[in-house]
A protein has these predicted regions:
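Hydrophobic/aromatic beta-strand patches that form the interior of the parallel beta-sheet core
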Residues: 57-59, 151, 172, 245, ...
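Short aromatic-enriched loop/helix-cap "lid" or pocket-rim segments at secondary-structure transitions
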Residues: 69-74, 256-258, 293-295
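Short alpha-helical segments and helix-capping/turn motifs at coil-helix boundaries
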Residues: 38-45, 134-139, 189-190, 282
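Conserved core of the PLP fold type I
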Residues: 85-244, 251-273
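Conserved core segment of the aminotransferase class I/II
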Residues: 3-7, 13-14, 104, 269-356
Length: 358
């Protein structure tokens, strides 16, 4: 008898098939899961081909590469990381994140627009997450009910579907293009209206700027239109909760790094922010600071009520504590060291701009 056959036998000599084990040991919602998504499956095939000497090209890259094919690493970041004190390398970080990191990451997300937004009565806060994916997960887990649908653009990053499934929600989509304009306003308005008929909360993940996988970025006019549509939907449905989540994972390499900060600043100055509308940013240091494996991100939240922002922090922290416990301290300290030192910041900026031009 083969070892695997012996291992599959129970104490009474019963031989179990994989199908029987899955049916017995795994609840239905778990048995349908697969660990490797399409991206990582093809990455494994590329690595096998390369190792065997074949002339293979990696088309699955979720990171920045030099023209030589080597991983792009910002030397200012890697040097600063290695300079951190033992405490920063080994100690836990506070569950919400290091205080100076939480302040800094809001500026990284919104730029000069942040102070304007805050000046006009919009309160902001941020919490650390393990990469941008952690922020996406937190929003899906807490801003929709199980069984609800999340609104995405038709063409989107594949793992959005994985995160949605893990949170027990489905997906709805609106077009990536609007014909002669960037935004299909009619389709977006219609989809929001339909979702509000079916559920009490609406959450949309909008990957902009530098949309993955197309690289497209909305213009300032298109951003204003999209924000206006969400604000109108909230105003017209005061008993529904509306959240626009801006996934800015690649914002550092777009032409308008802080375009959404500028758009929100204009909105805060000129318009009434509905109390039932939340705007959130998903920040990721994976690309902006080439810290792919350090898993450093943040969820930034904007709302006109300070007490509600504080409540959101507590809600999101509960999810983080019960899912990944806490996020790493070292990358938070590294980013703060870079952005609080003029020479390091300028060096980081030069390298980021070089990578942007590749």
């Amino acid at each position: 008898m083969k070892p695997e056959e012996i291992a599959a036998m129970s104490g009474d000599g019963k031989s179990w098939s994989l199908e029987e084990l899955e049916a017995t040991m795994l609840p239905g919602h778990a048995s349908t899961k697969a660990g490797r998504d399409v991206i990582f499956s093809w990455l494994a095939r590329y690595q096998e081909a390369k190792a065997s000497g074949q002339n293979a090209i990696n088309g699955t890259v979720g990171s920045l590469l030099e023209d030589s094919g080597e991983l792009a690493v910002n030397p200012v970041v890697s040097k600063t990381l290695r300079e951190q004190a033992d405490l920063e390398m080994s100690a836990y970080a506070p569950l919400p994140g290091l205080p100076h990191f939480r302040t800094m990451v809001q500026e990284l997300a919104m730029g000069d627009g942040l102070s304007v937004i805050q000046h006009h009565g919009i309160h902001t806060d941020a919490i650390i997450t393990p990469g941008g994916t952690g922020a996406l997960y937190m929003s899906a887990r807490n801003l929709l009910r199980p069984g609800d649908a999340i609104l995405l653009r038709e063409l989107h990053w594949g793992p959005y579907n994985t995160i949605a499934k893990e949170c027990g929600i489905s997906t709805a989509t609106w077009p990536l293009h609007g014909g002669e304009s960037q935004v299909d306003e009619e389709a977006l308005t219609s989809m929001l209206s339909q979702l509000m008929k079916d559920q009490n909360h609406v959450l949309s993940w909008l990957n902009d700027p530098a949309h993955n996988p197309t690289g497209m970025s909305l213009t300032s006019e298109s951003r204003a239109r999209v924000l206006g549509i969400f604000a109108d939907a909230a105003t017209q449905n005061p008993d529904k909760g509306v959240t626009l989540f801006i996934d800015g994972a690649y914002a550092a390499y777009s032409k308008e790094h802080h375009g959404w900060g500028d758009t929100l600043a204009e909105f805060a100055k000129e318009c009434i922010w509905p109390g039932n509308m939340l705007v959130s940013f998903g920040f990721s240091a994976s690309k902006s600071h080439t810290l792919y494996g350090q898993r450093c991100g943040a969820m930034v939240m904007l709302h006109p009520n300070r007490a509600f922002v504080d409540k959101l922090v507590e809600v999101m922290l509960h999810t983080g504590r019960g899912t990944w416990s806490g996020a790493a301290r070292l990358p938070q300290a590294t980013l703060h060291s870079i952005h609080s030192d003029v020479d390091k910041y300028v060096g980081w900026l030069r390298e980021r701009d070089r990578l942007q031009q590749m």
